Regions:
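Short amphipathic alpha-helical segments and helix-helix/interface helices
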Residues: 23-27, 68-69, 106-107, 125
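Active-site neighborhoods of divalent-metal-dependent phosphate/nucleic-acid chemistry enzymes
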Residues: 77-120
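Acidic, PIN/NYN-like endoribonuclease modules and their adjacent C-terminal/linker elements
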Residues: 78, 108-149
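Alpha-helix capping/helix-boundary segments
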Residues: 9, 42-43, 85-86, 106, ...
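Short, well-structured N-terminal submotif of metal-dependent ribonuclease cores
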Residues: 1-38, 53-65, 145-147
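ABC-type ATPase nucleotide-binding domain
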Residues: 49-50
Length: 149
């Protein structure tokens, strides 16, 4: 299975707490030995989250740095190469009413690159359903060996 991680799913590696559902999804990906993709735009969004946490003084910079190195240098995660088509499609989703451009880029990339987008984002899921768009989304409870083919 080839899976693109929504930003929420890279946060634990960066030392940022997430829900048990997200932790479970990451564990399942490891069990089925999925090909795991990430976007530089998720790294940017993670930095925004880190900045918010820094302001609250509940942030471990060293852990974030180690996690960032793990994501970008370990070879376990594959960096996306977004294309012109991905950005064009992301803008189309914005014009259709979905205002989160990071989500739009990730969703467009999943379509154009043939990846499943692992997310717990119900707003994105509802947008895709309401517009009759191709559903590439997968939630943690949908990860299994049967899907890894």
């Amino acid at each position: 299975m080839k899976v693109l991680l929504d930003t929420t799913f890279i946060l634990p590696t960066l030392g940022i707490e997430v829900s048990e559902e997200v932790e479970d999804g990451i564990r399942k990906l490891g069990e089925i030995e999925a090909e795991i993709y990430y976007s530089r735009f998720s790294i940017l969004e993670s930095i925004w989250i880190a900045i918010r946490l820094m302001k609250k003084r509940s942030f471990d910079v060293e852990r974030f740095d180690q996690g960032l190195g793990s994501i970008m240098k370990s070879g376990r995660y594959i960096e996306l190469e977004e294309t012109y088509r991905v950005f064009k499609e992301a803008l189309r989703f914005y014009m259709l009413g979905h205002r989160d451009m990071i989500d739009n880029i990730l969703y467009a990339a999943s379509i154009n690159l043939g990846l499943k987008l692992l997310t717990v984002d119900s707003e994105l899921r509802e947008f895709i359903r309401s517009k009759g768009l191709k559903d590439t989304l997968i939630s943690p409870d949908q990860i299994s060996d049967e899907n890894s083919g």
